[in-house]
Amino acid sequence: MALEIPKIEAILRGIAILLLVSTACLVGLDSQTKFVIVYEKEVTYKDLHALVVLVYVDAVAAAYNLLQLCRCSVSALSKGNFKGSYRYLSWACFVLDQLAAYTTFAAHSAALQHSVLGITGAKVFQWMKWCNRFTRFCFQIGGALTCGYIASVLMVMISFISAFNLFRLYSPKHFLRLKGT
């Protein structure tokens, strides 16, 4: 079981990287041009500020998971005893995994909320509905958000694994005392 956990973590990180990169690419490269009344209107991800934030957050989260995947590979190849520094590394990985999972989920939720305004519009603010005119743009953003939420769920699972890796170092009988001491 202990040998399978790093493999599962590496697989989850690899899939999360692919989903985060595909989300960033789908959102970042999405644009559509249509004639609206008498002028040509192009809609891109830059028109919705939450989508701009989403592209940056997904790119940073994918880079972080790539660095963690490299760390998993290096620690699997080296069979040294890193007990003293491993505790601090486990704490850092745990906190950063939690931060990455919560940040990506928050960015995807903000982008979803902003996208719902694009679907429904807001008469109070005189915002028009976009998705009845720019259907391909909306479908592509919807697919990207689906990929992003799946990546967020995978990152939550990764943070469960990093929590397990951290708290298995501590004694179950003594509060915050390492097992070896």
UniProtKB/Swiss-Prot annotation:
Keywords: Cell membrane, Membrane, Transmembrane, Transmembrane helix. It is a multi-pass membrane protein. InterPro entries: CASP/CASPL (IPR006459), CASP_dom (IPR006702). Pfam families: CASP_dom. The chain crosses the membrane at residues 8-28, 50-70, 99-119, 141-161. It is found in: Cell membrane. Its main location: membrane. Residues 29-49, 120-140 are extracellular. Homodimer and heterodimers. Belongs to the Casparian strip membrane proteins (CASP) family. PANTHER family: CASP-LIKE PROTEIN 2C1-RELATED (PTHR33573:SF30), CASP-LIKE PROTEIN 4A4 (PTHR33573). This is CASP-like protein 2C1. The lineage of its organism: Eukaryota, Viridiplantae, Streptophyta, Embryophyta, Tracheophyta.
